[in-house]
């Protein structure tokens, strides 16, 4: 007998903001495939009664928040955590880092069929705020606003304005998810959707052949060479007000490397000592020990994490008299040799790889075409597909999660679950895609050494208003891998990585403000970029007060309390 496909719902809670009275004052749910089926109510008990009987897949946007209320309720109503799918238990996927992916509530079995409702996080499929989804996806409804701090006692009657706000919220996510599902994007995360899309194009059989599963031991060694984006502030400009400058960023930096660069495939061969050129295995990861000093006039490129001798986020000018232990892709190693003088070098061992170009060509061509010929939702989905794939290759095989429990004070606590691993995807690919991305940004920045202020993954920030020679022939607002002229600023101030302000030249075109130049600007936009700073705090920033030590007690911090989660005002300080 064929079972009916499971229904899917977009859900949302509105909650009180007091530590001593933490509860859900309103809920909403809407059928993702039939927006006329929805309900908005004011009782968590009523919502959970529906959850236990609906046997559907539910989506909350930021399950880490709303899920805490659900697990509080389950724990207080006879449900216990279990990984074994027993009746009247629930299971979770919560990562070691506290990322929530799923709550699976099991009611029992009908024959062999599990009777359960599964709750997912739509934020993992659509990693944007609801307001941005509505705007970028050009949906029929836009996100509204309500007073979150208003007194709402138990049994509070929802006002028409609040009702409309909740309905809008669940409908925005319902519409966006439906578009994804219609495109066949039905996995738990954007990365999984992207990987599935890639496998569909090259076939699972070819994928397994080209990207074999490496042993956990081999994967661990490869992973030592895996690094993120290049984010660096030139000391020369740190904490100073700077005059005019320009920002350029690479169009789709990671897909551009995937499209054209030499990338690894197949089983690696382990070698001892120093890599010797092998045309069949032209890429390699080298394990070396050495001391190093930055050459005069060069940008530092080496970070050493997990070491007691060095700050993990600092690009080093010197090894400081210590022997540094490094695993580097040949791309990173060549860059290091160009930028540093190396001393007492010991080549220990390494891994070499077969390599080719074009593995991702069909996938990137498909989604780039969709991106450039579509508007709204489909355009955003194409961007998501293009940008979510590379990270999936380097997924950590250690998937040991956290298990929730109710503490004595009635709030949720979390303990580390049993150690759990999964097969790695193909980490060498992640290593080389990110290495080529750093190479792209660093070589462009180095060629503008006398002008470079700051680099952030795919962008370079320069003094002056002339396009530098190194990129002048590859500037285009849309072409894959070209540099787009992002903005020109009148003045700026940079304090540290991901912490800077700019007065940006703007001009009016067809009633809209767009980036301008010193010659044609009609307005100035004050832009604040600061990791961890909320929009509310950004409104307090000026050129005068933007410095190390700037502090405001206005940053909402989630705190687990009896009943669920409350956002309490915490202090944000630029350190």
UniProtKB/Swiss-Prot annotation:
Outcome, altering residue 14 to A: Strong loss of 3'-5' exonucleolysis
Intervals of motif YCDTD: 454-458
Effect of residue 128 to A: Slight loss of interaction with TP
Phenotypic consequence of residue 379 to T: Slight increase in DNA-binding capacity. Reduced affinity for the initiating nucleotide
Domain of life: Viruses
Phenotype when changing residue 384 to R: Reduced nucleotide insertion fidelity during DNA-primed polymerization and protein-primed initiation. No effect on the affinity for the different dNTPs
UniProt keyword annotations, A-Z: DNA replication, DNA-binding, DNA-directed DNA polymerase, Early protein, Exonuclease, Hydrolase, Magnesium, Metal-binding, Nuclease, Nucleotide-binding, Nucleotidyltransferase, Transferase, Viral DNA replication
Lineage: Viruses, Duplodnaviria, Heunggongvirae, Uroviricota, Caudoviricetes
Result of altering residue 128 to Y: Almost complete loss of interaction with TP
Record-annotated site: Probably involved in binding template-primer structures: 252, 387, 391, 434, 438, 498, 500
Impact reported for residue 254 to V: Loss of discrimination for rNTPs over dNTPs
Species of provenance: Bacillus phage phi29 (Bacteriophage phi-29)
Name used for this protein in its record: DNA polymerase
Domains: entry comment: The N-terminus contains the 3'-5' exonuclease activity and strand displacement ability. The conserved motif YxGG/A located between the 3'-5' exonuclease and polymerization domains is important for DNA-binding, coordination between DNA synthesis and degradation and for the formation of a stable complex between TP and the DNA polymerase. The C-terminus is involved in the protein-primed initiation, DNA polymerization and pyrophosphorolytic activities. The YCDTD motif is essential for the pyrophosphorolytic activity.
Outcome reported for the amino acid change (mutating residue 15 to I): 95% loss of ssDNA-binding. Decreased in fidelity of DNA replication
Positions bearing the site annotation: Interacts with the phosphate groups of the incoming nucleotide: 371
Substitution effect: residue 206 to I: No effect on DNA-binding. Reduced TP binding. 70% loss of replication and 20% loss of amplification
Annotated segments matching region Initiation, polymerization and pyrophosphorolytic activities: 230-562
Site for Involved in the stabilization of the frayed 3' terminus at the exonuclease active site, residues: 148
Effect of residue 252 to G: 40% loss of DNA polymerase activity. No effect on translocation or stabilization of the incorporated nucIeotide. No effect on 3' to 5' exonucleolysis
A molecular function GO annotation: exonuclease activity
One Pfam family recorded for the sequence: DNA_pol_B_2
Disulfide bond in keyword set: no
């Amino acid at each position: 007998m064929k079972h009916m496909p499971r229904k899917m719902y977009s859900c949302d809670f509105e909650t009180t903001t007091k530590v001593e009275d933490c509860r859900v004052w309103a809920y909403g749910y809407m059928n993702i495939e039939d927006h006329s089926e929805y309900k908005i109510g004011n009782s968590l008990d009523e919502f959970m009664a529906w959850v236990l009987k609906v046997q559907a897949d539910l989506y909350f946007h930021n399950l880490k928040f709303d899920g805490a209320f659900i697990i509080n309720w389950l724990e207080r109503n006879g449900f216990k955590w279990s990984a074994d799918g027993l009746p009247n238990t629930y299971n979770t996927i919560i990562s070691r880092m506290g990322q929530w992916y799923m709550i699976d509530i099991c009611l029992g079995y009908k024959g062999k069929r599990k009777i359960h409702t599964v709750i997912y996080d739509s934020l993992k499929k659509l990693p944007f705020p609801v307001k941005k989804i509505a705007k970028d996806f050009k949906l029929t409804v836009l996100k509204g606003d309500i007073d979150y701090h208003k007194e709402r006692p138990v049994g509070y009657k929802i006002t028409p304005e609040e009702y409309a706000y909740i309905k809008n919220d669940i409908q925005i996510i319902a519409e966006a998810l439906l578009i994804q599902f219609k495109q066949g994007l039905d996995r738990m995360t954007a990365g999984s959707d992207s990987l599935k899309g890639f496998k569909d194009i090259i076939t699972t059989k070819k994928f397994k052949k080209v990207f074999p599963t490496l042993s956990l031991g081999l994967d661990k060694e490869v992973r030592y060479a895996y690094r993120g984006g290049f984010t660096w502030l030139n000391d020369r400009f740190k904490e100073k007000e700077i005059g005019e400058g320009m920002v350029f960023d690479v169009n789709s930096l990671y897909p551009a490397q995937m499209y054209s660069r030499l990338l690894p495939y197949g089983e690696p061969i382990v070698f001892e000592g120093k890599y010797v050129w092998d045309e069949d295995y032209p890429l390699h990861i080298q394990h070396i020990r050495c001391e190093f000093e930055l050459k005069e006039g060069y940008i530092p490129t080496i970070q050493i994490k997990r070491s007691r001798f060095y700050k993990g986020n600092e690009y080093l000018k010197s090894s400081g008299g210590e022997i540094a232990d490094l695993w580097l892709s040949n791309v990173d190693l060549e860059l290091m040799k160009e930028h540093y003088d190396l001393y007492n070098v010991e080549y220990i061992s390494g891994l070499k790889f077969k390599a080719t170009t074009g593995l991702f060509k069909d996938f990137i061509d498909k989604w780039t075409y969709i991106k450039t010929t579509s508007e709204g939702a489909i355009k955003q989905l194409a961007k998501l597909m293009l940008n979510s794939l590379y990270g999936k290759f380097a997924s950590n095989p250690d998937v040991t999660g956290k298990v929730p429990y109710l503490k004595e004070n009635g709030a949720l606590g979390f303990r580390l679950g049993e150690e759990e691993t999964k097969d790695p995807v193909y980490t060498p690919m992640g290593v080389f895609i990110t290495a080529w991305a750093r190479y792209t940004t660093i070589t462009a920045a180095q060629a503008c050494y006398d002008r470079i202020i700051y680099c952030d993954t795919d962008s370079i920030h320069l003094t002056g208003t002339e396009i530098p020679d190194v990129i002048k022939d590859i500037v285009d607002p849309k072409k894959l891998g070209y540099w787009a002229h992002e903005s020109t600023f009148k003045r700026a101030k940079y304090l540290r990585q991901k912490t800077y302000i700019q007065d940006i030249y703007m001009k009016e075109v067809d009633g809209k403000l767009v980036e301008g130049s010193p010659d044609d600007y009609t307005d100035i936009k004050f832009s604040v970029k600061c990791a961890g700073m909320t929009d509310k705090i950004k409104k307090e920033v000026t050129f005068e007060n933007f410095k190390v030590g700037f502090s405001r007690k206005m940053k909402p911090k989630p705190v687990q309390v009896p009943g669920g989660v409350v956002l309490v005002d915490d202090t944000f300080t630029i350190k």
